[in-house]
Amino acid sequence: GLTRVDILSMKIDKRVIQSGNSIGGAISQDGRLVAVSNYEPGGVKIFDAATLELVADIPAVYGNDRQLSKVIGLVDAPGQKFIFSLWDAGEIWVADLSSPAKPVIRKFKDIGLNPYDALITPDGRYYIAGLFGEDGMALLDLWNLDDGVKRILNNYGKGEQKLPVYKMPHLEGWAIAGNLAFVPAIGRHEVLVIDTTTWTEAGRIKVHGQPVFVMARPDGRNIWVNFAVPDNDTLQVIDTQSLKIVKTLTPGKGVLHMEFEPRGEEVWTSVRDEDRLAVFDTETFEQVTTIEAKKPSGIFLTFRAHRTGL
């Protein structure tokens, strides 16, 4: 379902059932459209933000036998666009919703096996999809779509044995800090560092476990990382100048998500298995407070409304 919540009254304002299993959402540049990506039946549906009425339905149909693909990595982009990836098809689609009832779709095929998540850079220029089915990532320059998709980090991990993946990692625009991008390495206890001026590997950082979220503090000074089971009681902080771990924290069992205050002075973390939130000072790394909550998962502050791709 797609649910709209009035955050002032803390009540559900409206809800519509729109698919069998949905995975992500995004809001258009002008705030008038809400897009939802679906595993089942596969595709993206666009709704009017004011009424939650269906505006456009974009089935993720691919191949000669017209199968439906799971859709992941949905983000908003400048120019009333939504970008998303097709897990089963190995494609990236760019949907222009300038005329909402008649979306214009541009498809990029053969980007790699099983894109599992994606990010858009804060300036809205680059869309990067991580690949689960093979090493490397797929890069699309949204300012120069005719150049097509470029493969980056193709040789990372060649010939190496991956560990079992216990939790699918996530890519988000907050993994960008200055001219560097920090991304989780699938099936490895590493964070990859990418030079965004050349889109080549700039380093690898050994970490405590398999990274799930790799998030930059708003000023880009450090990177906070959480991990999949069995290491999901731990957070590590990476200095973006030295590329070294400067702090390891153990907030508790089931650290699932992090969210920074808009200026980065604090980071909120969900500690699901201990039914609480833990808030840390990002300079001293001291715990500021805890808040009781029943099985908290994602944490989303309202400043996201002013950020592309979040």
Residues of each region from the PLM?
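Predominantly soluble domains enriched in secretory-pathway, periplasmic, or organellar proteins
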Residues: 1-310
